[in-house]
Swiss-Prot record:
Its EC number is 2.1.2.1. It comes from Arabidopsis thaliana. One of its GO terms (molecular function) is glycine hydroxymethyltransferase activity. The gene is SHM7. Catalyzes the interconversion of serine and glycine. Residues 61-85 have a biased composition (Basic and acidic residues). Its cofactor is pyridoxal 5'-phosphate. This is Serine hydroxymethyltransferase 7. CDD domains: SHMT.
Length: 598
């Protein structure tokens, strides 16, 4: 290449004037002040040349490859070296590149013209691999978990479920729980989310709220509801957090008397068990040890002395109806907000099969499973609108407002104070369950559940068993085992080996001491499977037989709990009773054939 002409034909100039760089001024079009310009000498076009001027192009677009092969030497000394040169033109000059350009992309494209299709194939392969990773059924994705799930399925099918807080959900609820709604994050309340894309989630939650009010016969201008709590314990703590400062007072039914731990339970030794008792000051009221009923007179005396800011009614192991009107009077006298935890009786409340806490309470909380047959979760109802001042009300906590201010406080406590995003699959499942609560079929179910509990209580009483309060008004009963010399701990273990599930519970003894001397028995789950009064008569026989086996084993092994448990696996009486229980249970289908009997 002749480089002698390049300095006259091709020059670089700057927007600023530099006379030394351009001996012969030539016209050029300025681009911008103080910017670099490409300056071409006008005389270039008139110079004779064998090449026609061509526009500047990318090297790979105009590269012309020529191959020169050295002739083999006549002495036969091996093959000639193959050399590959590249020739191209730029600004009319013929140029030859002797050294191979380091351009892997260019060489790859020239040697592999179908590279793009190969790349697309690789991308599709990677996409398919990712999709396949998340598209396996449980038995392939995780055989270990699948095996355990199958075992739990068989346990439910082949056993008698008498735990009062358990039930079997319907098919539609199960489908919603396992749906795509679990994918969406939706922190906040409907219409005020922290994430976008929640227009349909908002509609689902609003529909759930509407159905919750309808299920319990409530007017939206008088009651509001939050359906986001993860559990009733979470719902209860949200109420405390929203309405109280740390260290302020709450008062609920003592746990051994039938209350729930989330109502502020402390052990007799003073150990704080519940977060409610850790962050707030709690003081319990109790049942009458002779009758097992709540002593409302003593409750009033204690409340007037203690002056709680929140008075809690409701429990988890109380078999009798509540006098909500009397508790309302007590709350008014001591100036407390009245809250009811109706977790165990919510189905009875919805169908008007027990006294109604909404007639008297300011706040009502509940689980969403148990009698409601919904998903596991919590719910909070709260009053809104103008307050109705009752005669004899004492405002000891400086409450002079004329309207309820519970809504904003409770909603803020649920989110962002205590929870993050709600479980949208749970809210949809709850909406389905609440729709069913408003049907005549559900009312018939609750009525049968209550009849079954009374039939079971009567059957045990005829067999000389002692029941706390002598019976039941709802879905559960408490069997005091102490007259038989048994504790709930050993008895529930024998029942479990016989495929009967129930739970031990503390009994408030006649002498004022607390011992886990009883068991709690409930009828919701087996009523769901189709059992009626006569079936619970049969179950009473199973329970009595299990108690007899427990007494015999306890006499044989004395106080050695280790030997007692060891003997359960080889006991012939247990094996015989287990076979009878399984044969009985297999007669009844699980709801909507969710779990097939095999």
């Amino acid at each position: 290449m002749d480089l002698s002409r390049s300095q006259t034909n091709f020059q670089l100039g700057f927007g600023c004037s530099h006379a030394s760089m351009t001996p012969t001024p030539t016209p050029r079009a300025p681009i911008a002040d103080d910017s670099i310009n490409l300056q071409v000498d006008q005389s270039f076009r008139s110079l004779p040349t064998t090449f026609s001027p061509i526009p500047l192009q990318l090297l790979e677009q105009k590269a012309e490859k020529t191959t020169t092969v050295d002739e083999p030497k006549k002495d036969g000394g091996g093959g000639g070296d193959q050399k590959e040169d590249e020739h191209f033109r730029i600004l009319g000059h013929h140029m030859c590149l002797k050294r191979q350009r380091d351009c892997p992309l260019l060489l790859t494209q020239s040697k592999h013209p179908k590279r793009s299709s190969i790349g697309d194939s690789d991308l599709e392969s990677r996409r398919a691999a990712v999709r396949a990773w998340g598209d396996q059924p449980i038995h392939l994705a995780d055989p270990d978990i699948h095996e355990l799930m199958e075992k739990e399925k068989q346990r439910q099918v082949r056993g008698i479920e008498l735990i009062a807080s358990e039930n079997f959900v319907c098919r539609a609820v199960m489908e919603a729980l396992g749906s795509h709604l679990t994918n969406k994050y939706s922190e906040g309340m409907p219409g005020a989310r922290y994430y976008t894309g929640n227009q349909y989630i908002d509609q689902i939650e609003n529909l759930c709220i509407e159905r919750a009010l309808t299920a319990f016969g409530l007017e939206s201008d008088k009651w509001g509801v939050n359906v986001q709590p993860y559990s009733c314990t979470s719902a209860n703590f949200a109420v405390y957090t929203g309405l109280l400062l740390p260290g302020e007072r709450i008062m609920g039914l003592d746990s051994p008397s039938g209350g729930h731990m989330s109502h502020g339970y402390c052990t007799p030794g003073g150990k704080k068990i519940s977060a409610a008792s850790i962050f707030f000051e709690s003081f319990p009221y109790k049942v009458n040890p002779q009758t097992g009923y709540i002593d409302y007179d003593k409750l009033e005396d204690k409340a007037l002395d203690y002056r709680p800011k929140i008075l809690i009614c409701g429990g988890s192991s109380y078999p009798r109806d509540w006098d909500f009107a009397r508790v309302r009077q007590i709350a008014d006298k001591c100036g407390a907000v009245l809250m009811c935890d109706m977790a165990h009786i919510s189905g009875l409340v919805a169908t008007k099969e027990c006294s109604n806490p909404f007639d008297h309470c300011d706040i009502v909380t509940s689980t969403t499973h148990k009698g409601l047959r919904g998903p596991r979760g919590g719910i909070i109802f709260y009053r809104r609108g103008p307050k109705i001042r009752k005669q004899g009300h004492h405002s000891s906590h400086c409450d002079t407002s004329t309207h309820y201010d519970l809504e904003e406080k409770i909603n803020f406590a649920v989110f962002p104070s205590l929870q993050g995003g709600p479980h949208n699959n749970h809210i949809a499942a709850l909406a389905i369950a609440l729709k069913q609560v408003a049907t005549p079929e559900y009312k018939a179910y609750i009525q049968q559940m209550k009849k079954n509990a009374q039939a079971l209580a009567a059957a045990l009483l005829r067999r000389k068993c002692r029941l706390v309060t002598g019976g039941t008004d709802n879905h559960l009963l408490l069997w005091d085992l102490t007259p038989m010399g048994l504790t709930g701990k050993v008895y529930e273990k024998v029942c479990e080996m016989c495929h009967i599930t129930l739970n031990k519970t503390a009994i408030f003894g006649d002498n004022g001491t607390i011992s886990p001397g009883g068991v709690r028995i409930g009828t919701p789950a087996m009523t769901t499977r189709g059992c009626i009064e006569s079936d619970f008569e049969t179950m009473a026989d199973f329970l009595i037989k299990a108690a007899q086996i427990t007494s015999a084993l306890q006499r044989e092994h004395g106080k050695s709990h280790k030997e007692f448990v060891k003997s359960l696996c080889t006991n012939k009486d247990i094996a015989e009773l287990r076979n009878r229980v399984e044969a009985f249970a297999l007669q009844y289908e699980m709801p909507a054939s969710l779990i097939r009997i095999e």
